[in-house]
């Protein structure tokens, strides 16, 4: 029975426009993700980015922000910190903080693209020259994707208007949609998280920055999530 329901749901998703289907898939994935699987993905990103950037002077470090995963509602409040570190000096050059939804998007992008980069590098007869060229090209594509995810964040309701507001649960909406919803409801339209007060119900989201963008794979995460100071 459960498999039948799952198959029917997937059939419906397959008929949706690509943009909406991807959003639905990410929401479903974050909803079914266990805490152990989440930690496994954080560790996997550290491993994958270390392999891809093994010949570069900088590397990424993904960590769960201390205390953000201690609540029973960890999926709502958990934050993942991504730090770019210079290997030789140990200096932190950039740091970003992401919610669970943003982290899952970044995870899927990095792992899918890195698989191709690593496979091509392993079959190359001249890794020194070809590997460098492939990584540089791939990095540009990844950074473009991250910029798109952050600069053009869309409303979770209409999937059309640009997101103007973000709730404490990290779901974002355009002003038009959330105005209609908030006239009758005091909770999030997506996860139903209850808003406790008018002053903290709708929070204006900060525009993402483009600090320290470079031309290689390590900068893919610089624009994911929001700026973070350790």
From Swiss-Prot:
MF annotations from Gene Ontology: ubiquitin-protein transferase activity; zinc ion binding
Covalently attached lipid (N-myristoyl glycine), positions: 2
Highest taxon above the source species: Eukaryota
Keyword Transport: no
A single GO cellular-component term on record: membrane
GO biological process: one example: regulation of DNA-templated transcription
Compartments it resides in: Membrane
Alphabetical UniProt keywords: Lipoprotein, Membrane, Metal-binding, Myristate, Zinc, Zinc-finger
Ligase recorded as keyword: no
ZnF RING-type: positions: 155-192
Gene3D superfamilies: Zinc/RING finger domain, C3HC4 (zinc finger) (3.30.40.10)
Membrane topology term: Lipid-anchor
Tissue note: Isoform 1 is testis-specific. Isoform 2 is expressed in heart, brain, skeletal muscle, kidney and pancreas. Isoform 1 is not expressed in fetus or in azoospermic patients.
Matching PANTHER family: RING FINGER PROTEIN 141, RING FINGER PROTEIN 141-RELATED
Main function: May be involved in spermatogenesis.
Name assigned to this protein: RING finger protein 141
Organism: Homo sapiens
Gene expressing this chain: RNF141
């Amino acid at each position: 029975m459960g498999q039948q329901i799952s198959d029917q749901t997937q059939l419906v998703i397959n008929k949706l426009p690509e943009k909406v289907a991807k959003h639905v898939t990410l929401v479903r994935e974050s909803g079914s993700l266990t805490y152990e699987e989440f930690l496994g993905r954080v560790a996997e990103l550290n491993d994958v980015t270390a392999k891809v950037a093994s010949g570069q002077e900088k590397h990424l470090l993904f960590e769960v922000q201390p205390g953000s995963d201690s609540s029973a509602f960890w999926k709502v409040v958990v934050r993942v910190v991504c730090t770019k570190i210079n290997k030789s000096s140990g200096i932190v050059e950039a740091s970003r903080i992401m919610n669970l939804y943003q982290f899952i998007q970044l995870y899927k992008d990095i792992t899918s693209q890195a698989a191709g980069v690593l496979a091509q590098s392993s079959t190359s007869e001249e890794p020194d020259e070809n590997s460098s060229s492939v990584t540089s090209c791939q990095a540009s594509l990844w950074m473009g994707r991250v910029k798109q995810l952050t600069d053009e964040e869309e409303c979770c309701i209409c999937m059309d208007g640009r997101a103007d507001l973000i709730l404490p649960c990290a779901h974002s909406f355009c002003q038009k949609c959330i105005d209609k919803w908030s006239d009758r409801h005091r909770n999030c339209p997506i996860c139903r998280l209850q808003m406790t007060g008018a002053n903290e119900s709708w929070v204006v989201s900060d525009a993402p920055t483009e600090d320290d963008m470079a031309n290689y794979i390590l900068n893919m995460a610089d624009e994911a999530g929001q700026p973070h100071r350790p």
